[in-house]
From Swiss-Prot:
GO terms for molecular function: RNA binding; structural constituent of ribosome. The gene is rpsI. Keywords: Ribonucleoprotein, Ribosomal protein. PROSITE patterns: RIBOSOMAL_S9. This is Small ribosomal subunit protein uS9. GO terms for cellular component: cytosolic small ribosomal subunit. Transmembrane segments: none annotated. GO terms for biological process: translation. InterPro entries: Ribosomal_Su5_D2-typ_SF (IPR020568), Ribosomal_uS9 (IPR000754), Ribosomal_uS9_bac/plastid (IPR023035), Ribosomal_uS9_CS (IPR020574), Ribsml_uS5_D2-typ_fold_subgr (IPR014721). Belongs to the universal ribosomal protein uS9 family. NCBIfam families: PRK00132.1. The keyword Cell inner membrane does not apply.
């Protein structure tokens, strides 16, 4: 990992993404695979491209991502957060624009734990009146 990379760490649910960006042609590689192969749904690709499209940097950077934990949606959100932070590391003047779109803020929503005596976090056992 030698060279002039800009780095950003992104988190979402239980997923953590380490994002490295450098000047290039717009390739996005996630865990050694092209992004369109790694994310099976189109929504995942759309989510990770949002900060790049907002700042008009879609074909400006080559992006290398290591992401682990969570599912596909959480990983896409973590990658988006990491790309946003890496873009701010590259050029701090992009922060107000990215912040206004809500990409800088870490989405703090986590899965609520299951409670004792309930079927799920809030779902109680079925009640029978008779």
């Amino acid at each position: 990992m030698i060279g002039n990379y800009n780095y950003g760490t992104g988190r979402r649910k239980s997923a953590v993404a380490r994002v490295f960006i450098k000047s290039g042609s717009g390739q996005i590689v996630v865990n050694g695979k092209p992004a369109n192969e790694y994310f099976s749904r189109e929504t995942g690709l759309m989510v990770i491209r949002q900060p790049l499209e907002l700042t008009n940097n879609v074909e400006t950077f080559d992006i290398m991502v290591n992401v682990n934990g969570g599912g596909e949606s959480g990983q896409a959100g973590a990658v988006r957060h990491g790309i946003t932070r890496a873009l701010i590391d590259y050029d701090a003047t992009l922060k107000p624009e990215l912040s206004k779109a809500g990409f800088v803020t870490r989405d703090a929503r986590e899965v609520e734990r299951k409670k004792v005596g309930l079927r799920k976090a809030r779902r109680a056992k079925q009640f029978s009146k008779r």
